[in-house]
Every structure is written in structure tokens, then in C-alpha cells.
């Protein structure tokens, strides 16, 4: 009997507007080293030997995508114009759109469009450490700063012990059918791991590093540029 080897597919939800960047252009298209911000992580995903296809979930009204040349990334890259109003909506819409291409036990890696500093080793480590995991997991880094819990007036109520606290990153990697069912049941989930948690399961944390940052504010764009420019030097 032939053993079935699960494949890996990436989904990048990119239907958001990035309002905290205070720009008229969607955040994923802001220029970074001469390319759209999203280009950099797509290039790494498309070049990953273990990733079969990379699906980018875009807004139905996205007119910016076609203004750029993505052909250099090769045939793995597939745009899907079916994005929803939230991250969870977009990921679920993407999963439904490609349901015929992905087997139930295949792995799906969901990556933030606004994390341009993804490196090949991030993907390799995630896939390696989760290969035999029954649930899946996500890249994350231990919380380094002291955390405070406050009230609505920003008065400190308590200091939160940071032991065993982690900051979630992406990619987040789960089995296709498990992820789809979890998102269908938890439509308000802020990330895939929280949807899996809501289903009563326990994702595994795979330690990453601070270079895999999410561009949220204008200063983050400069930091991402520095990381990409100095990577490997």
C-alpha cells in the first residue's frame, strides 16, 4: 500500500486596507525596496521546495494587484479574488475556492501579507517541527517586555507575568479539513490558531525570531527595509 505524503499549500489573506498605516494605498502594496511589500514574503513562499502552491486571497474590488508584474514568482502563485471583510472570512473563502485542489490531510500555511521578512528557515523549521503533530501550530516568539493590564482609563490594574507568554506570528500551519471546520465554527477568530483553540485543540508553538515582524505602523516599514537589506550580511 502506497503511503500518502501530505503536501503543503500557502494561503496569504491580502484583502485588508491597513488603516493604521495612514495611507491611501492598501498596506500590502506599499513600496519596500522597489517592490510591493507583499512581494517579499510571496517570493520566499514560492521558492520554498515543500510548498506546492501559494494562494493570495484578494478583495473582489482589488485593482492594484494587476498593476504589478508577478510573473517572476513563477507558476506556484495563484491570485484569488474572493476576500472577505475579515482575515477569517478571507482565509475561509480561499479554502473554499481551492477545496478541490487540496486533500483533507494536506497542510495549509497561512501567512500575513504584512510580514515581508519571512525567511526560508522560518518555513523549514515550522514544517519540520510540525510534520508529525496531530494538530499543527504556528511560529511565535517569547514575550520579552513587561506586560500591564489596564482599565478603560489606562490606569494600570496589574502586571501580567510573562512566563509562558508568547507573541503569535505567521505562518500558522494546520491540516486543511481541520482548519476549515475550525474557521467555519469560529468566524470571529483573529488568527487561525485561535479558531483551532476554540475547537478544543492545542496548537504547538514553534520558536521564531523578531525579524519576522508585522508591518503595522509607518516605522515598521523602515525596520523591515533594514532587516531585508542586511539579511545574510
Curated annotation (Swiss-Prot):
Site (Transition state stabilizer): 20, 27
UniProt KW Transferase keyword: yes
The EC number(s) this enzyme carries: 2.7.7.60
Site (Positions MEP for the nucleophilic attack): 162, 214
Pfam family, one: IspD
Gene3D superfamilies for the chain: Spore Coat Polysaccharide Biosynthesis Protein SpsA, Chain A
Annotated metabolic or biological route of this protein: Isoprenoid biosynthesis; isopentenyl diphosphate biosynthesis via DXP pathway; isopentenyl diphosphate from 1-deoxy-D-xylulose 5-phosphate: step 2/6
GO molecular function: 2-C-methyl-D-erythritol 4-phosphate cytidylyltransferase activity
Gene Ontology biological-process annotations: isopentenyl diphosphate biosynthetic process, methylerythritol 4-phosphate pathway
InterPro entries the UniProt entry points to: IspD, IspD/TarI, IspD/TarI_cytidylyltransf_bact, ISPD_synthase_CS, Nucleotide-diphossugar_trans
Class of this enzyme: transferase
Keywords: Isoprene biosynthesis, Nucleotidyltransferase, Transferase
Catalytic activity: 2-C-methyl-D-erythritol 4-phosphate + CTP + H(+) = 4-CDP-2-C-methyl-D-erythritol + diphosphate
Domain of life: Bacteria
NCBIfam families: ispD (TIGR00453)
Family to which the UniProt record says this protein belongs: Belongs to the IspD/TarI cytidylyltransferase family. IspD subfamily.
UniProt-listed HAMAP family: IspD (MF_00108)
Task performed by this protein: Catalyzes the formation of 4-diphosphocytidyl-2-C-methyl-D-erythritol from CTP and 2-C-methyl-D-erythritol 4-phosphate (MEP).
Name assigned to this protein: 2-C-methyl-D-erythritol 4-phosphate cytidylyltransferase
